[in-house]
Amino acid sequence: MNFINPKTDFAFKKIFGSADSKDILISFLNAILYEAQPVIEDLEILDPYLAPKIKGVKDTYLDVKAKIGGSKTAIVEMQVLNVESFEKRILYNATKAYSVQLKSGENYNLLNPVIALTITDFQMFEHLETVISRFCIKEKNNLVEYLADELEFVFVELPKFDKTLAELETLTDKWIYFMKTARTLRSVPEELGNVPELRKAFTIANEANLDPDELEDLERREIFIQDQRGAITKATRIGIEQGIRQGIEQGIEQGIEQGIEQGIEQGIKQGNMTLIVRQLERSVGVLSPEFKTSIAQLSAQQLENLGEALLDFASLSDLTTWLQAHNNRQ
């Protein structure tokens, strides 16, 4: 058997956000958020699209969104690449999920708590040893929690999890092991298969149960991730080399440091642009010089946004619409 990689957005949504994934998501959230205690007995899987209430505010797409316990909202995101400003995007998505609960004129007491759960395939907090970390709003000096315990941020850093199959003890361990290793497995381990929800997750993740269009979409996304990882590595190396040369030409130590920093930034942006153009041409056809010029004029953040959006483009008209919308925001 071959299993799809639950770390890709397509697979993650299919496993945890499908109409028949309710029991899987309950087990997963209880394992990660509540140390496998059955705190969540029921939930409602919601549309992960956060439509803005105010014209001009950025649209948001989450991987999975659910109403748990009748009132609290959990937003879940799987992130493979450590992209620029990702930590700010988490804050933005959480506060937006909190604020869109109210309509104009409604009372603030109608607001319900939001938990933002983020699973990363990279280390976000190198100074922390724990695999799961939790953040909330506290007073800076005395660490007293804010009066309204409304926002919580939970992170699972997969690279920090190093338990083997034989070392798995808790349901939490088993779900994290599934997230980290499912793609490399060729059968369902007995240690995981004895959990009904995990066994069902493996069934959904079995490539044999996907139709050709789903397999093609999955392959495109995995190729994109690998290309982007390679482009970032290459761009960083080129940027460092350019920065060192620039600093040496300036002849000062400060110039070398500044040159390296600027070179890395410029190199990464150029590498991302090259990668995005290549991915676009795979999806929608050859781009004209005008399209390439428009893409080159985008900021680093806009390039990142385009890199996420292009996977859903079906034609050049989709790209045209996206560029027009984002050029109007500049």
What are these regions (language model features)?
Residues 1-330:
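Elongated, amphipathic alpha-helical interaction scaffolds
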